[in-house]
Design a protein with these regions (language model features):
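A short alpha-helical element within helix-turn-helix/winged-helix DNA-binding domains
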Residues: 26-37
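Short helix-to-turn junction characteristic of helix-turn-helix DNA-binding domains
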Residues: 14-21
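Key DNA-contact positions within bacterial/archaeal DNA-binding proteins
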Residues: 41
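Short alpha-helical segments that sit at the start of domains
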Residues: 1-14
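Beta-hairpin "wing" of winged helix-turn-helix
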Residues: 53-63, 67-69
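Short, hydrophobic-biased segments on the C-terminal half of alpha helices
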Residues: 47-48, 77
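Alpha-helical residues within the helix-turn-helix
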Residues: 34, 51-52
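Conserved segment of winged-helix/HTH DNA-binding domains
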Residues: 72-84
């Protein structure tokens, strides 16, 4: 099965957030964009979709960012792929 670029980036965002789960500060879009070499504007759209879908909790402003809304082991990859 081939994944679209959108789905690939979506999974990368979720994996990055899962790997950073124990941090005090939330993950930022800039951090993920620099880590994977993806445009910030593209990631912003993906994060908005994940937030609307109940997978990410986002906080705006200084000290803001994103976190997983539920534990990583409860997120089904198939569910994410079908939704994107």
């Amino acid at each position: 099965m081939r994944l679209t670029q959108w789905t690939d980036y979506t999974l990368r965002v979720l994996m990055y957030c899962a790997a950073s789960d124990g941090r005090a500060q939330p993950v930022t879009i800039t951090e993920v964009a620099e880590s994977y070499g993806i445009s910030r504007s593209h990631l912003t759209k993906i994060v908005q979709q994940l937030s609307a879908g109940g997978l990410l909790e986002t906080t705006r402003g200084r000290g803001g960012g994103m976190r997983l809304m539920r534990p990583a082991n409860e997120i089904n990859v198939g569910e994410v792929v079908r939704a994107t």
